[in-house]
């Protein structure tokens, strides 16, 4: 999808305020919903994914399973709200050995497991809105000893609220981010800078 796009800085793949936030996403929902609502905390439109079973309630990008994103930027960032329910997301990449690997983070797992084609890891989220920063290059190197080449697919499962999903060439400070990439919390009048912790230690 983005193979022929010049990639630098920030590359957004989902923005909840956009006219068609799920334009490049496929929706798979059973016993749940994906809908745009106004979040009371930030007083802004967000995308809510909820489901009784996280494995049957998710969105994925690109829509066509035979196509790939082709995003080479190494930082995957999501601005999401902790709904105090099970939540997971998955990023599929390809490394310099031309092997496809999947990284799955969830808030209900207690230990990291590294298998040849999938690495699952626990994710700790703070209350309310979180900015999840996922260093794909670092995780590929630590889990498999190979080099990150590009991201192929993304899958975001219930249960969460999403403000924005984007890729970046590096980590940006609050001051460096464009205004539309920031998350303002009107009640406290300040930026949310919460970033979850990932555990990458072997069992």
Swiss-Prot record:
A single Gene Ontology CC term: axonemal microtubule
GO process terms (BP): cilium assembly; positive regulation of cell motility; positive regulation of feeding behavior; regulation of cilium beat frequency involved in ciliary motility
Protein name (database record): Cilia- and flagella-associated protein 20
Pfam families recorded: CFA20_dom (PF05018)
InterPro entries attached to this UniProt entry: CFA20/CFAP20DC, CFA20_dom
Localisation: Nucleus; Cytoplasm, Cytoskeleton, Microtubule organizing center, Centrosome, Centriole; Cytoplasm, Cytoskeleton, Cilium basal body; Cytoplasm, Cytoskeleton, Cilium axoneme
Keyword presence, Manganese: no
């Amino acid at each position: 999808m983005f193979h022929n796009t010049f990639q630098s800085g920030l590359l957004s793949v989902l923005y909840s305020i956009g006219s068609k936030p799920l334009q490049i996403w496929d929706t798979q929902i059973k016993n749940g919903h994906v809908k745009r609502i106004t979040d009371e905390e930030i007083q802004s439109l967000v995308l809510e994914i909820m489901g009784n079973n996280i494995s049957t309630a998710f969105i994925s990008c690109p829509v066509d399973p035979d196509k790939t994103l082709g995003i080479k930027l190494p930082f995957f960032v999501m601005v999401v709200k902790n709904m105090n329910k099970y939540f997971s997301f998955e990023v599929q990449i390809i490394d310099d050995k031309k092997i496809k690997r999947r990284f799955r983070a969830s808030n209900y797992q207690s230990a990291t497991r590294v298998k040849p084609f999938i690495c699952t890891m626990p994710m700790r989220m703070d209350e309310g809105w979180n900015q999840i920063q996922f260093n794909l290059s670092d995780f590929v190197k630590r889990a498999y000893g190979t080099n990150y080449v590009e991201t192929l697919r993304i899958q975001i499962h219930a249960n969460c609220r999403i403000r924005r999903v984007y890729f970046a060439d590096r980590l940006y400070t609050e001051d460096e981010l464009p205004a539309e990439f920031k998350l303002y919390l009107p009640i406290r009048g300040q930026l949310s800078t919460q970033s979850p912790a990932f555990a990458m230690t072997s069992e």
